[in-house]
Swiss-Prot record:
Name by which UniProt lists this protein: NADH-quinone oxidoreductase subunit D
Keywords recorded for this protein, A-Z: Cell inner membrane, Cell membrane, Membrane, NAD, Quinone, Translocase, Transport, Ubiquinone
Localization of this protein: Cell inner membrane
Organism, scientific name: Cupriavidus pinatubonensis (strain JMP 134 / LMG 1197) (Cupriavidus necator (strain JMP 134))
Sequence similarity: Belongs to the complex I 49 kDa subunit family.
GO cellular component: plasma membrane
Amino acid sequence: MADIKNYTLNFGPQHPAAHGVLRLVLELDGEVIQRADPHIGLLHRATEKLAEQKSWIQNVPYMDRLDYVSMMSNEHAYVMAIERLLGIEVPIRAQYIRVMFDEITRLLNHLMWIGAHALDVGAMAVFLYAFREREDMFDMYEAVSGARMHAAYYRPGGVYRDLPDTMPQYRASKVHNERAIKVMNEARSGSLLDFIEDFTNRFPKYVDEYETLLTDNRIWKQRLVDIGVVSPERALQMGFTGPMLRGSGIAWDLRKKQPYEVYDKMDFDVPVGVGGDCYARYLVRVEEMRQSNRIIKQCIEWLRRNPGPVITDNHKVAPPSRVDMKSNMEELIHHFKLFTEGMHVPEGEAYAAVEHPKGEFGIYAISDGANKPYRLKIRAPGFPHLAALDEMAKGHMIADAVTIIGTQDIVFGEIDR
């Protein structure tokens, strides 16, 4: 029999485990990876350049479409950068709403990650469970913004509107009979806060279900333990952030180290992994879901007790209320200018970073005093993680490449921008 020679394999961009449009050129020795070369750019939409043509406010929906699994976290960094340039204060209630939705977004992201990661490795049930929970969180997005995914809910100076007092109800259809609808609408009888609170009470039990299926599962551990090991020093050198850095044993979290909004008032822990392998990163993200649930509960408690404005009263930045606009000439002028020309942001530059579900998501905005950005640089957390794929996959089997891509939690919207 002839000796097995080195050969090259194209992985993706149509592979179900490629998480989008990853094209990976693998150089193999038998079934062992010698080199993994990621080819990016297949989802490049020139977001940074498009942002230079649109007004500051028109760019908010573009942010949703970067990492399209963690929509509101992207918006948050962008509006924070604008607020730093403008030097405006955000009402405290709006800050709590933002923090609450940041954590709901973290749950959305981590549920997508655990479902897809498990499916890649061969466990299908977790995927179905995770999407059951995501459905409830899409309803939360829809209640505040009208959109299930691309919310465009955050605004410079606050949020688009306050939390609604009612939730949409399901109606009987060919798919669900009256009895099923009654069960589905049980949690939807009150306000959005009631609905979110009901979800946070149920959620720890769901995380226990995922852990029952995976954490001590022999096959899961065989596929994840000692795969894609990254030392703490190497993780820092390669620019890792978020769960990828914490999985390697470094307790770095922007919510604790550089608190923004009201994170300094929140009581939560930062999970840190031991070992720096795929299993450590899995445990970190699972614990992060529990901590996010804690933060959401604290926000609900505060928001119930403290009504107030949810957007700045500076009408050069945020539109006046419809009542004021229709009864006051000055407010009408503000409204007209905002929705035609847009606001003018003072000359300067600002960098704002948030602890995005995937790591540090940063926006570096430069203004020349016009109504649109002079330059917008997006710091995507997934980019350095994907750049490390070659180093993490070297010496592993082809099947392990899928596990490593899964543990990196790659989304190409933000990498290709």
